[in-house]
Each structure stands twice: as C-alpha cells, then as structure tokens.
C-alpha cells in the first residue's frame, strides 16, 4: 500500500512531504529540579539574613555585658575598700582599750605627783616615816601642831608646812613646786622601813 502511495505521489509530480516538527516539552525532572533550586536559593538568602541579624544582636549583647562587667568591677572595688575600712576600724576598736591602759600606766611613770597625792600620809604617819629624827623633836612638833591647827580638819599645806623636811633651821618654807619630790622621799623612806 505504501508503494502505491509513493507511486501516486510520484505520478502527480509532487515532492516528498517534509517531516513534522515536534515541539520540545521539558521533562518532569527538569521542572522539579528548577523549582527545588529556586526554593533553596530563596531559603538560603532568608537564613543568611536571619544569621546576620542574630550576629548583630549577639554583638550588642556582648557590648552590654562588657559594660555590666566594668560596673560590677567598680562595685567589687568599692566593696573591697569598705571591707578593708571595716577591718581596720575593728582592729582600732579592739586595741584601743589596751592603748588607753598603757597610757594610764605611762602617765603614772611620767607624772608621779598626780596619783600619789591621795596617798599622802597623815601627820603622825608621815612624820614617823622620816629618817634621822629625835624623839624630843617629835614631841615638840606634836605640841606645836595641836596649838596651830585643829586635829579634826588638818590641811595638806599645814601637814607639809609642819614637816621638818620642809623647814630650814631658820629659813623660809620650801617652794610648793618641790612638794611632790618631798612626798616621794617620804614614801621611799616608808618603803625602806
């Protein structure tokens, strides 16, 4: 039959018909691959933008943390300074009574006249404590004391003025500034007895 058709066509003097043009249809795999690649590209761009924003946030948080760390360091220095001040104050408070006691003891050594004044002996005790006295002189002085001063209210000035250590044979009274030394001599004489 094909041979008969060819013969008819050749008899008519016609040319051979041209082959039909077939339009190229994209394969399904190519379509899926293109869509996948496009979607992945958009997704990567979105993730990149999110990561960039996250990096900016982390950088800002790091700056804030550095500022907080410097503030904490300042507070820590203040706390350490306050702690050292409290420790030094506690040391001063604990050692202050001891220093005061030493000061009182030192005051006794440097100012002997002040604490020894209340311990001034009575006329009888003080006169008996002096060395190198005769019994006759003691009797005469006791009589003079009874005449000049009341025994109920003797004064320290009268007691010291009647002491033979303060009077010369016919001379004036010893100056009041020398009285503490005489008192010390009396106490030392009593201690030696």
From Swiss-Prot:
Keywords: Coiled coil. Residues 39-68 form a coiled coil. Residues 101-176 are annotated as: Disordered. Residues 135-146 have a biased composition (Acidic residues). One of its GO terms (cellular component) is cytoplasm. It comes from the Eukaryota. Disulfide bonds: none annotated. This is Coiled-coil domain-containing protein 184. It comes from Rattus norvegicus.
């Amino acid at each position: 039959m094909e041979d008969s058709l060819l013969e008819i066509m050749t008899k008519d003097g016609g040319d051979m018909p041209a082959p039909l043009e077939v339009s190229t249809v994209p394969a399904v795999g190519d379509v899926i691959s293109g869509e996948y690649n496009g979607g992945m590209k958009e997704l990567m761009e979105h993730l990149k933008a999110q990561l960039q924003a996250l990096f900016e946030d982390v950088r800002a948080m790091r700056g804030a943390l550095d500022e907080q760390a410097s503030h904490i360091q300042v507070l820590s220095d203040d706390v350490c300074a306050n702690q050292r001040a409290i420790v030094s104050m506690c040391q001063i408070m604990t050692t202050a009574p001891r220093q005061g006691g030493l000061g009182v003891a030192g005051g006794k050594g440097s100012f002997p006249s002040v604490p020894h004044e209340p311990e001034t002996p009575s006329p009888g005790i003080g006169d008996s404590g002096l060395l190198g006295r005769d019994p006759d002189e003691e009797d005469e002085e006791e009589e003079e004391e009874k005449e000049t001063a009341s025994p109920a209210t003797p004064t320290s000035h009268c007691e010291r003025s009647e002491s033979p250590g303060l009077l010369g044979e016919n001379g004036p009274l010893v100056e009041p500034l020398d009285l503490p030394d005489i008192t010390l001599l009396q106490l030392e004489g009593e201690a030696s007895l």
